[in-house]
């Protein structure tokens, strides 16, 4: 499993891991951040949740030597109920992990041919294919514009309607690319990037679930406990920024977001858009 956690040293130092502390990893993925938390201080325990059962199962194997210090939970962070637990720190890494992105059958990437799926939680019924092949033109254009900030949203939606049915990621990517002026088709950013982002957000209801999590999570912290959120695009970062700032029980610790150093981006290009924001519970 080749997934490199992003901004890991900045996150771990920002959370100030305490001996015998209890931490919530709200987006376990393949366990990179959890492993670093457990190694940062003695007798630390982590509650690790993820909506992706495949990632959760893999992490239980990868973190087998730490399992006595980890409680695994299959849940979306918006639905998680800590009951009576209070945490010394909470983290959420909002990015799609590299393993999901590089697994063609998950349908997240236009770089690999696979079915248009994009579900983080494989138990849910709505897929990218259902949206692409059954939604009306106006609704498609709206999600491309709102969640992808795609300026050609109407043109792309119209072309999708004309080209349906579309079954694979590469078919959709080709339709989108053909809507873009030729000189922009082969730049650094693939022309389908924004459409794929918008679809993934819609399929998984990412922003509404993030909003719920950000409203609930501060109340799960002990006084003096910290929360760190890593976002990867402007819609997420804006929501994180305003939610942390508007929570009366939190003190924001990052006036501006922490971003990766050049050497991290050189090793892991997917880190380039990451932003970390931190806050501490006051009362």
From Swiss-Prot:
Pfam families noted in UniProt: Methyltransf_5
GO terms (BP aspect): rRNA base methylation
GO molecular function, one term: rRNA (cytosine-N4-)-methyltransferase activity
Domain of life: Bacteria
Any single Gene Ontology cellular-component annotation: cytoplasm
Localization in the cell: Cytoplasm
Key words of the record: Cytoplasm, Methyltransferase, rRNA processing, S-adenosyl-L-methionine, Transferase
NCBIfam families: 16S rRNA (cytosine(1402)-N(4))-methyltransferase RsmH
Function: Specifically methylates the N4 position of cytidine in position 1402 (C1402) of 16S rRNA.
Identification of the protein by name: Ribosomal RNA small subunit methyltransferase H
Lineage of the species this protein comes from: Bacteria, Bacillati, Cyanobacteriota, Cyanophyceae, Oscillatoriophycideae
